[in-house]
Amino acid sequence: MKRFMQIWKPAVIGFLLLTLVCGVLYPGVVTVFAGVAFHDKANGSIIEEKLADGTTGKVGSAEIGQTFTEPEYLIGRAASDGVATNLNPTSEEQKQLVEKRIAWWHKLDPTNNRVIPMDLVTASASGVDPDISEAAAAYQVDRISRERGISTKEVKEIIAEHTSNRLLGFWGEPTVNVLQVNLALDRLKM
């Protein structure tokens, strides 16, 4: 029995110590730090708006894309809808999905004869991207302006207000947050 305790006692103590450090202390410190330093992001970047009935309600997250299909809204990337998004770029299935999405865009705005930006006809890896490229937003300006009866200048200004720049001025591409633009467009009615 003494030999058994000599072998297992350090293992059990090590297990309990690592469980305490890795399972309680570290996650607790990180959670508290995130809540203090990055309060908004740590809590889901929830956007609250004044609703039609005068109350304030949660309308979405700035970090998770919502589906918009109405022509008066800025429309984001295609949702993956349970379809694998890691298809080979040259596969027949990917080609058919892209062709279907191109047809949808032409049906939505038959007067727009510009080339559809790639991010509007391909799905993201996560399927929930909240942002689109500046080119994808610019592609939709005329339609939104026409549908809402406002100037293209107003639409462009709203898009510019909700465009994030490159990280550190050189990393990545500027992106436009779809939900924030659509909420700003809806605020014009008020």
UniProtKB/Swiss-Prot annotation:
GO CC terms of this entry: plasma membrane
Membrane topology classification: Single-pass membrane protein
Tree of life domain: Bacteria
Name of this protein: Potassium-transporting ATPase KdpC subunit
GO MF annotation, one: ATP binding
UniProt keyword terms in alphabetical order: ATP-binding, Cell membrane, Ion transport, Membrane, Nucleotide-binding, Potassium, Potassium transport, Transmembrane, Transmembrane helix, Transport
Family indicated by similarity: Belongs to the KdpC family.
HAMAP family referenced in this protein's UniProt entry, alphabetically: KdpC
Gene from which the chain derives: kdpC
Quaternary organization: The system is composed of three essential subunits: KdpA, KdpB and KdpC.
Biological role: Part of the high-affinity ATP-driven potassium transport (or Kdp) system, which catalyzes the hydrolysis of ATP coupled with the electrogenic transport of potassium into the cytoplasm. This subunit acts as a catalytic chaperone that increases the ATP-binding affinity of the ATP-hydrolyzing subunit KdpB by the formation of a transient KdpB/KdpC/ATP ternary complex.
